[in-house]
Amino acid sequence: MKMIQPIHFPTVSAFMHALGRADVRHPLIEVIHLDDLADCSAFGNTRYTMGFYSVVYKDARCGTVRYGRNEYDYDNGTLLFFAPDHDVELGTLEQSYQGVMLIFSPALMQGIQMSPYTFFGYSVNEALHVSERERQQLHDILGNIETELERGIDRHTRQLMAQNVALILNYCIRFYDRQFITREPVDSQLMQRFTVLLDDYFAQGLAARQGVPTVRYFADALNLSANYFGDLVKAQTGNSPQQLIQQHLIAQARHRLTTTTDTVSQIAYALGFEYPQYFSRLFKKQTGLTPQEFRAQA
């Protein structure tokens, strides 16, 4: 099957022109009401990349969307987040939809740290589902942005726009925290699977063959994006996946140091370290003792 070549929209203005909008209200940000578009179906069955961030809120059921490796058929009250320069593939679309799309350039957010907004790295099957009350909160902030867009550009516009975008994203962090709580039974099962996978990785000798396990390895095994997996684990345990992996690794090391006569180098290689000194450094950082000192005291 021939791969569809993506259509690239480098800027907010380029995207607005493609929608048939000759007048761009601001070159770095725009709010698009999907029901104002003449024919959404024309954008279906196509791959896109964009040089800007986009946040899409859908009021009604939409067609399929592929983002990264996953496909999702999403429903009412759903928010999707797309980072710049990622492939977005749309399936068959209907002619019209109810919803809002917020698009903004990375240049707008200069001076604002984007790293806390990890949901831009989530897969589409990890979308945010919002309540009516949450939807109204976001709608009110979008209203502020629309007011600024209609007002015209002055020396305050950029800062006010960026602050309102950041406010929306901060609310989305809160709403995702709520979603993690309401999904706790499902997420607890994922945590149990993660623990089993972690145990098996060392029990089956994968560490010696493939190296120290990575967060990406377990996220892939659970069919989650690395960002969503990290936030899920943090919400469930208070620790990052990397911290849990290191804790498990040190527990394995303690066991081997006290129950075998293997050298420190042999243990390091068995646990996936290419260089024993890296293992010794991590062990001392975690325990306050070198492996040799720990073995001597055991």
Regions found by a protein language model. Give the residues of each.
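…primarily DNA-binding HTH/wHTH and HhH modules…
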Residues: 280-298
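Short acidic-glycine-tyrosine-enriched beta hairpin
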Residues: 69-81
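A hydrophobic/aromatic-rich effector-binding and dimerization subdomain
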Residues: 91-153
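Terminal helix-turn-helix DNA-binding modules in bacterial transcription factors
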Residues: 235-274, 296-298
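Short hydrophobic/aromatic patch on the recognition helix
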Residues: 77, 229, 278-279, 283
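A short, Lys/Arg-enriched amphipathic alpha-helix from helix-turn-helix/homeodomain DNA-binding modules
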Residues: 184-222, 243-262
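Generic protein-terminus/edge-of-domain signal
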Residues: 1-66, 70-72
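An amphipathic alpha-helical interaction segment
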Residues: 140-199
